[in-house]
Amino acid sequence: MTKKVSRRLRELQAKVEDREYGPLDALSLLKETATAKFAEAAEAHIRLGIDPKYTDQQLRTTVALPKGTGQIVRVAVIARGEKVTEASNAGADVFGSEELIDEIQKGRMDFDKLIATPDVMPQVAKLGKMLGPRGLMPSPKGGTVTFDIASAIAEFKAGKLEFRADRTGIVHVMFGKASFSPEDLLVNLKALQETIDRNRPSGAKGRYWRTFYVSATMGPSIRVDINALRDYKLTEAA
């Protein structure tokens, strides 16, 4: 069955040419095509030359977006003793120990990011079936298993994101709000590009970046010239 495309989206698609755009032009066009009746996110969709079924071709890491995400991030912390107090003092929205694990098991999910100290991970592991599908399971690679609770809370509230390539090798990342200026979006997109390049899996072969698109949440896809983004100096974008 052919998916019906709305008139609004058809009109927006007509504004996008079938070519690669320079980074700033692409982001200006993203803003122009963000016409939904809610605050749309700016999204990147990147197909990489990797096959994640092989362990040396998997990508899972974090990026610190210099201009933030534009979202209020609710952080929960599971820890013990003085680390629970540290979490409270550092601005965690939800914090606790075994009692919080029990509450989550019963369905409590009023947070966007879950941080745990290494000593409680054996207990947190039993929440895997609930947290895993929601992308909330703490992991060392994601920076969410740590004893440095205060720093982790500050980073995630300031705009640190965890992302991974899906099983087809595609990365989907929200890198700000469509309401950001093109220049601020470019600063965040540059940070994302550098992070993906820096964390290239050892088993990746051939061309690493295959296709690279940006879009607003409800907007059309806009193809970006990855080489032009790589060549951009942050002083130009900032």
Curated annotation (Swiss-Prot):
Transmembrane segments: none annotated. One of its GO terms (molecular function) is tRNA binding. SUPFAM superfamilies: Ribosomal protein L1. The keyword tRNA-binding applies. PROSITE patterns: RIBOSOMAL_L1. Keywords: Repressor, Ribonucleoprotein, Ribosomal protein, RNA-binding, rRNA-binding, Translation regulation, tRNA-binding. GO terms for cellular component: large ribosomal subunit. It holds the Pfam family Ribosomal_L1. GO terms for biological process: regulation of translation; translation. It comes from the Bacteria. InterPro entries: Ribosom_uL1_bac-type, Ribosomal_uL1, Ribosomal_uL1-like, Ribosomal_uL1/biogenesis, Ribosomal_uL1_3-a/b-sand, Ribosomal_uL1_CS. Binds directly to 23S rRNA. The L1 stalk is quite mobile in the ribosome, and is involved in E site tRNA release. Part of the 50S ribosomal subunit. PANTHER family: 54S RIBOSOMAL PROTEIN L1, MITOCHONDRIAL, LARGE RIBOSOMAL SUBUNIT PROTEIN UL1M. Belongs to the universal ribosomal protein uL1 family. This is Large ribosomal subunit protein uL1. It comes from Trichormus variabilis (strain ATCC 29413 / PCC 7937). The lineage of its organism: Bacteria, Bacillati, Cyanobacteriota, Cyanophyceae, Nostocales. The gene is rplA.
